[in-house]
């Protein structure tokens, strides 16, 4: 099967990682959705890609600088188009309620270490299938995820050149 991932939702048509982008992805026929998870100051898991919100909202700083309630007051849509003025940040659990029961494949990137258990708890609560891949550049986060659930599908994102050390690590950890 060929997976047509909507990267951060239909991010060419709506502000990335918003409900509008995820809804648009389905309208356009995507059979996969890629998204990014981070933790807020008060411990909530939200969907957002960048390290800072400066270019994707009407405020400045990091997701971890704000509580979820504070983030709800920010505009995450106008940067893309005034049509999306007032677009809210998405709580991962709200996304999960709406989408994880659908016949789609999901690529969920962990941007922060330490959100593995809560992420898995939410997935297990709402997912009706196992077409979910957890990815991260942080190998430790993936190791933590594997310890919690030995059956979860993992994908290690690598920035540097692939070398024998990385290959051996993957082979040994996937026995």
Identify the residue ranges that each predicted region occupies.
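Phosphate-group recognition and catalysis centered on beta-loop-alpha active-site segments
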Residues: 1-175
